[in-house]
Amino acid sequence: MILYYIIVPLAWLVFNIGFRVRCEGRENLKKIGTKGCIIASNHISAIDPVFIVITRFWGQRMMVFAKKELFEINPFLSWFFRCAGAVCVRGTKEEVGAIDDTVKKCKEGGTLLIFPEGTREKENAFLPLKSGLFVVAAAAGVDVVPCRIHYDTPDGRMKPFCRVRVVYGEPMPAARFSMEGRRDLRKLRENKQ
């Protein structure tokens, strides 16, 4: 949607002024080239997707897996999140269709942002990974780029006007995720039909 291509550059301007966003490891994104990929990031704050999208944006729309509750706040926000590339995949009957559509777009060169822990971190501790990352990586056959967001504050939490570092790691081949992902995708299809 055209709205995406207006919002992202404006967000880049506002958030770079307000938060002094720094991107490290951009060369790892360039290794992907025009192929599709999955960016798998930690999740500290509700605003994390914005920082990742503005450091990755090159005129290409990014998809973001988002929890169901975000789409239930009100109809305007639901519409806005969909325009911004959010894909609702949790607890809905359309989950299989949404995943199939996301896989297709990744195969065609699209980028998916996913938070493999499934929720925001508490107290800077890593949480167990959910299966969504493995499912999409296996089905799409695209590389996974690890990403880490750092808020330069004493407690590592997002504060207004703090410095933000978005760090991209070396791409990991999809083959590393394929066995577990295919098993999870099969389970998902069996449960949803």
Language-model segments: residues:
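Helix-enriched interaction subdomains in cytosolic or periplasmic regions
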Residues: 1-11
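Soluble catalytic domains of membrane acyltransferases
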Residues: 8, 17-188
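A conserved mid-domain beta-alpha-beta active-site/ligand-binding segment of alpha/beta enzyme cores
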Residues: 193
